[in-house]
């Protein structure tokens, strides 16, 4: 599908791949869990926490819309000091001097995902991501054959 990596930004690639009959097992789509996931917050500044929460909203909106993905499993509920400085949890370090186990903005995003509160809770993330509609985060994924056809069309257009 023309990409060396699968990220939340191009998650449609994985969705299209898993729904390709060539990847099926006994004629059925394989189960696909995104496990041990969560965006990181660099630190506990408000900007970093909002960025993490917006990243989580982005990821969850993708998962929600892509039918090939069966589940999203958060990496950890709390930041863990033994993970090399990563802060991928939905709550702060247990020994944080200001707010031990404090709920990060990402906690509220995860809590309200797929509930009637989702739209309201996720609204802040659009500004952070620089979009006006969640539709803007989705991309059409072309398989290799489609990409080759586009290249041929583009090459022909050069001569026309």
Where in the sequence are the language-model features?
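Noncatalytic carbohydrate-binding groove/subsite architecture in carbohydrate-active enzymes
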Residues: 1-46
């Amino acid at each position: 599908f023309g990409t060396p990596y699968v990220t939340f930004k191009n998650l449609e690639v994985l969705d299209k791949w898993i729904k390709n009959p060539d990847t099926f097992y006994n004629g059925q789509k394989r189960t696909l869990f995104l496990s041990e996931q969560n965006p990181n917050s660099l630190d506990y500044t408000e900007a970093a926490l909002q960025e993490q929460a917006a990243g989580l909203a982005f990821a969850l909106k993708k998962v929600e819309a892509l039918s090939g993905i069966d589940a999203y499993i958060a990496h950890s509920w709390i930041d863990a000091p033994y993970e090399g400085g990563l802060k991928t949890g939905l709550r702060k370090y247990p020994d944080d001097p200001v707010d031990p186990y404090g709920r990060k903005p990402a906690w509220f995003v995860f809590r309200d995902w797929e509930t009637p509160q989702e739209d309201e809770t996720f609204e802040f993330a659009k500004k952070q991501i620089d979009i006006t509609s969640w539709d803007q985060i989705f991309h059409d994924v072309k398989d290799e054959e489609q990409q080759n056809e586009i290249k041929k069309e583009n090459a022909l257009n050069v001569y026309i």
